[in-house]
Amino acid sequence: MDGDLAIGKMASSTSPMGPIDSLELLDLLFDRQDGVLRHVELGEDWGHGEDQVLPGADSDDFLNSILGSGDSDSPTWSPAASDSGISEDLPSDTQDTPPHGGVPATPAGCHSVESGKGPCPSYHPGPTCPARHLGPVAPRLETSVAIDLEMWSPGVYAEEQTDLADSPSRYNLTVKDLLLSSSSGDLQQHHLAAPHLLRPGTGHCQELVLTEDEKKLLAKEGITLPTQLPLTKYEERMLKKIRRKIRNKQSAQESRKKKKEYIDGLETRMSACTAQNQELQRKVLHLEKQNLSLLEQLKKLQAIVVQSTSKSAQTGTCIAVLLFSFALIVLPSISPFASNRAESPGDFAPVRVFSRTLHNDAASRVAPDTAPGSEAPGPGPNTGALQERSPGSPPGEWESQDTRALDNSTEDLDNSTLVQGNSVKELDQATLLDCAPPEPAVSPGHVGLEAAGGEL
């Protein structure tokens, strides 16, 4: 019941007057005479020692649960499930917009941050950092605070009441200072993600360390960053942009270096392949010349072989013709059949020559005495020719007649009909000789001739 009355009174007191100071709010709540919570039992006296107060870590957690930053982008936030909370009437986040002018509100002192500890290990005011220009920031408006008492149980409220009662005497800070210190602690926690950006400076401040490339790019962009932390969102964005450019530049340099090495390797290989190709081309030209010379030599050899073949053929032909002619001339004279014919007893008959003056007389020719059946079974081819020879013909004429007889014999062997005809003619001539009339009785003149012949 008292809680409802207190809430109604607080709402009626805060609604018409707008934003009030945090000290006035605390006086309104905890004043012993006119405070809203003056009738609420606090459990024990405020004068207990430090051993009965909540530990520092628990009190910090409790304060962070009330005043902590659920949203890292803004220093203050309001719980989503409650109608009341801490709100700040700002047009937009001051760290999201670039600075325009003025001096930003900073905490009483910035403290060094150690890894593994909370963002604000102590609330004692330390030596302030050197004054620096953080850029123009919109002025911070006064905050109006509304507290919902239904969220607190009596026991928790008693402990919190003890902690809050002891905190002003120990730390001498206001709610506004706690809010600002909480927001600065969030920024410091955000900067802990990049420890290489920080360097311990003089006192309790952190110093921003920039490389030469970053300084050059910042100077080129016309941006001036402070040497002390924390940085605003705009400054952080610009620093990230500069570092991204540096990384891109380094990666581009590495890629260009690799590309250059690759191209150099390709050029080296190409030069080696070109030299090898030229050497092979020279070898090919040399081989082509050798091939042409060998072809010319082959043609010459072929021409020589053709000429020698034709000459040998002509020589052989001439030799063959000469041998054939010699055979035709010599073979008839050395024929084995000619001697046999000459030595046969029936070829010649003895003829009585009475006188040289009667050599050409037909009466001196006397046919051989042959019986009708004494002739050889087969008529010889030269019988008629031998009988027609005159006894007084010279031997040269006989040889020529023999040669002709041999020729005729060769022809007779080829043509048997002609031979038979000649034999018939010879037989007819022999018959005629046999049928000749007998000679008359020897006259005295004839006897005288015979005697003269005998004397010769």
Curated annotation (Swiss-Prot):
Region span, Leucine-zipper: 280-301
Site of covalent link Glycyl lysine isopeptide (Lys-Gly) (interchain with G-Cter in ubiquitin): K289
Organism, scientific name: Bos taurus
Lumenal compartment spans: 339-456
Assembly description: Binds DNA as a dimer. May form homodimers. Interacts with ATF6. Interacts with SYNV1/HRD1; this interaction leads to CREB3L3 ubiquitination and proteasomal degradation.
Biological process (GO), any one: regulation of transcription by RNA polymerase II
Protein's recorded name: Cyclic AMP-responsive element-binding protein 3-like protein 3
Positions of the bZIP domain: 238-301
Pfam families in the record: bZIP_1
The gene coding this protein: CREB3L3
Segments of this protein annotated with the region Disordered: 1-20, 47-120, 365-423, 435-456
Post-translational modification: Controlled by regulated intramembrane proteolysis (RIP). Following ER stress a fragment containing the cytoplasmic transcription factor domain is released by proteolysis. The cleavage seems to be performed sequentially by site-1 and site-2 proteases (PS1 and PS2).
Top-rank taxon: Eukaryota
Biased composition (Polar residues): 71-85
PANTHER family: AGAP001464-PB, CYCLIC AMP-RESPONSIVE ELEMENT-BINDING PROTEIN 3-LIKE PROTEIN 3
GO CC annotations on file: endoplasmic reticulum membrane; nucleus
UniProt main location, coarse: endoplasmic reticulum
Transmembrane segments: 318-338
A Gene Ontology molecular function term of the record: DNA-binding transcription factor activity, RNA polymerase II-specific
Cytoplasmic side: 1-317
Annotated membrane topology: Single-pass type II membrane protein
InterPro entries: bZIP, bZIP_sf, CREB_ATF_subfamily
Compartment list: Endoplasmic reticulum membrane
Keywords of the record: Activator, DNA-binding, Endoplasmic reticulum, Glycoprotein, Isopeptide bond, Membrane, Nucleus, Signal-anchor, Transcription, Transcription regulation, Transmembrane, Transmembrane helix, Ubl conjugation, Unfolded protein response
